[in-house]
Amino acid sequence: MTKLVNEMILVLDFGSQYNQLITRRIREFGVYSELHPHTLTAEEIKKMNPKGIILSGGPNSVYDEGSFRCDEKIFELDIPVLGICYGMQLMTHYLGGKVEAASQREYGKANIHIEGEPDLFKDLPNEQVVWMSHGDLVVEVPEGFTVDATSHHCPNSAMSKKDKKWYGVQFHPEVRHSEYGNDLLKNFVFGVCECVGEWSMENFIEIEMQKIRETVGDKQVLCALSGGVDSSVVAVLIHKAIGDQLTCIFVDHGLLRKGEAEGVMKTFSEGFNMNVIKVDAKDRFLNKLKGVSDPEQKRKIIGNEFIYVFDDEAEKLKGIDFLAQGTLYTDIIESGTATAQTIKSHHNVGGLPEDMQFELIEPLNTLFKDEVRALGTELGIPDEIVWRQPFPGPGLGIRVLGEVTEEKLEIVRESDAILREEIAKADLEKDIWQYFTVLPDIRSVGVMGDARTYDYTIGIRAVTSIDGMTSDWARIPWDVLEKISTRIVNEVKHINRVVYDITSKPPATIEWE
């Protein structure tokens, strides 16, 4: 850890798709936190000098062959440890308690009763609702532990060994359905680990600028600039750190939103006085995508082609050693880790070719989207960029379902522009996390001008969210939806039907592909 971080909570990853929320919650308290693989050794952890360790949840049973484990010597480090769900079971298993398969798997809300006045539940109600998600449970706590909470199906819902500062909870405090989950985590972070809470985006900027300078030295960096908030923040942060050692490459792959290419060049080459090279690669990308309809294959093709374009440009520039990308925590999470299943590959993660010529710099890969926006504001980036709609690296290539053609791209481009205009007119931009149109590869019968039509359907996707890990469909007023639908059908060629996606995440992802 860099010396600019005085206190840190370490989270060990045992495979839950949502264990990164633990890290996020702790950062919200003003305490720096990082997620690392469960394979870290006790010696490595000791060098990191965390104020506390959290063992995350995960899908395994402690008795499964090949189940995820951690170094048992963690419990000899004299550092407070909190085990969550599988983390509690693993702690129990290592310290001599007993874990068994539950007679009934427990998923969802549960009521727990607090016993006595345990540290984790200080100043919290004796009865509270928590979120359970487990198939095994602790049937016998290790010697010296006390039972701190019970529930109907889980008699040992929480446990502790106060003198060692070891704690376990069978439920998930990081999930918002646990009504006092944040308070419990605060009690661990501030009460048990004695953190102060002085970490901020200002600290993050100092830390990352120092890391960038140490990594890059006097070498040159290429930044993959798209004009979206992620790559914009990366570009400004790196430019602030190393100045003219940064060259931004903006690839117009023909998969951008309406007016986006012109806007990017104006904003960054003029507004931020950066060296920006525009590459017109539309034909190159569309030729590669010809005949391809599988979404994963499209993502991989676009990711690969991006890197090859940069390779070509770097060769022209000479002496480029690093490639900067706006990869976020959520990109890495959804692309899968050694412990988490892949949901879908992100072009910043899963689409990288093995023969890549650059070393990657990804200064945002520990941040969630809302943290990136806060960072952008701290860096002085204008609101119109900081609050720009999230836009995937593969662009409209994954908003055209099935094979990508110029005609289909134009349909999505025009319909999306109408959607954005009407959302802006209704002053809903900051109320909705993300909104866009998609073109499913389906046609339906319609009637326009007394004539039968057989044309495409446009889908509208709009969601509310905090960090992109989970989301709900946005309740856009009906009159606004009516205007959007009417304009799209009347102004966009080959569209005779508009539908609104009312699915949350999970079970759906925000993007359709």
From Swiss-Prot:
What metabolic or biological pathway is this protein involved in?
Purine metabolism; GMP biosynthesis; GMP from XMP (L-Gln route): step 1/1
Enzyme active site: 85 (nucleophile), 172, 174
Residue sites binding ATP per the record: 226-232
In the record, what terms sit under GO molecular function?
Answer: ATP binding; GMP synthase activity
Reaction catalysed by this chain? XMP + L-glutamine + ATP + H2O = GMP + L-glutamate + AMP + diphosphate + 2 H(+)
The coiled-coil segments of this chain are: none
Q: Where is the Glutamine amidotransferase type-1 domain?
A: 8-198
| Record keywords | ATP-binding, Glutamine amidotransferase, GMP biosynthesis, Ligase, Nucleotide-binding, Purine biosynthesis
UniProt-listed Enzyme Commission number(s): 6.3.5.2
Pfam families in the cross-refs:
GATase, GMP_synt_C, NAD_synthase
Recorded hits in SUPFAM superfamilies, A to Z, give:
Adenine nucleotide alpha hydrolases-like (SSF52402), Class I glutamine amidotransferase-like (SSF52317), GMP synthetase C-terminal dimerisation domain (SSF54810)
Q: Where is the GMPS ATP-PPase domain?
A: 199-388
The protein's matches in InterPro entries, at most eight in alphabetical order, are given as:
Class_I_gatase-like (IPR029062), GATASE (IPR017926), GMP_synth_C (IPR001674), GMP_synth_GATase (IPR004739), GMP_synthase (IPR022955), GMPS_ATP_PPase_dom (IPR025777), NAD/GMP_synthase (IPR022310), Rossmann-like_a/b/a_fold (IPR014729)
Classify the source by domain of life.
Bacteria
CC terms in the record's Gene Ontology section: cytosol
Q: Quaternary structure? A: Homodimer.
Job description of the protein: Catalyzes the synthesis of GMP from XMP.
| NCBIfam families xref list | guaA_Cterm, guaA_Nterm, PRK00074.1
Name of the protein: GMP synthase [glutamine-hydrolyzing]
Q: Which organism is it from?
A: Bacillus licheniformis (strain ATCC 14580 / DSM 13 / JCM 2505 / CCUG 7422 / NBRC 12200 / NCIMB 9375 / NCTC 10341 / NRRL NRS-1264 / Gibson 46)
The protein's gene is named guaA
